[in-house]
Swiss-Prot record:
Keyword terms, alphabetized: Ribonucleoprotein, Ribosomal protein
Iron-sulfur keyword on record: no
Family: Belongs to the universal ribosomal protein uS2 family.
Protein name, as recorded: Small ribosomal subunit protein uS2
Lineage, opening ranks: Bacteria, Bacillati, Actinomycetota, Actinomycetes, Bifidobacteriales
GO biological process, one term: translation
TM ranges: none
One MF term in the entry's GO annotations: structural constituent of ribosome
Amino acid sequence: MAQITMSDMLKAGLHFGHQTRRWNPKMKQFILTQRNGIHIINLFKSLDMIDKAYDFIKTTVAHNGTVLFVGTKKQAQEAIANQATRVNMPYVSERWLGGMLTNFQTVSKRVNRLKELEEMDFTDVHGSGLTKKELLLLEREKDKLNKQLGGIRNMNRTPSAMFVVDITKETLAVEEAHKLGIPVVAIVDTNADPDTVEYPIPANDDAIRGIELLTSLMADAVAEGLLERSGANKTEGEAAEQPMAAWEKELLTNEAPAEASAEAAAPAAAEGETAEAPKAE
C-alpha cells in the first residue's frame, strides 16, 4: 500500500482541478465540488486509485518488469528524471519522439549510436584522424542524442508498464503504449479522459510539488518491487547465479520504509487547506 496521507496531498495542492469550463465530464465521479470556478478533486477517491496504481507497479517490477517514466512538461521534467534514475528505470523527460515504442528497433539503433559517440575522445584531434570541425559536429550529435534518448539508454526492450504525467500532453506516448498492449498509470486532471488509461490517478497534474509527490511514490513502488524480486530470487536459489547490482544492494540497506499513516480529512478540508494557489488559466 502506498505511504501517503491526505495531509500530504492537500499540502501539495493535488485537489485543485482545472477551471470548470474546461472539465471532461468523464471525470465527474472524481470531482467533489467547485470553488471559485475551479473543480475540487475528491482526494479520498484519489487515495484509492493511488493504492491500485502502487500495487500494480510493485507487482509488475517484482515479476521482472520495467516501468517507463514519462513527463515532458516543464513542471514534470526534473521529478521524472530524478525519480526514475533513483530506481534505475528508463524515462523520457524531453520531447517524446514518434515511434519510441512502436518503432523500438530503430530507436535502439540510435541509442547504440549514442553509446558509440560516448566512447570517443573529442579532444584528441591527432589520435582520432578527424578534423576539429568533424569532431565538433560529432560531439553535437552526441549531445543531441543524449538529450533525446539518454533516459532510455539502458532500456533493452519495450517496458512492461508506463507512468505518465499529464495524458493530454503525452497523447502520443499513451497511444503507442496501447498499440503494444502496455498498461498505463497516469496522473489525470479534471480536463482529461480517465478511460484512456488503465490506472488513472485523479489529481492536479500542473503543481510541481504534487507531481514530485506522486512521481516519488511510484518510484517507491518500483523500489518495493525490486526488493520483493530480490527476495524471490533468494528463495528460489537464484541469488548465486544472478547477483544483485550495487544499486539494488543500496536500496536494501538505505531505503528505510516510510511509516504508514491513516490520517483522515473532512471534505471541507479538501476544499480549503492547501499550500498552493489554484491554477491560473
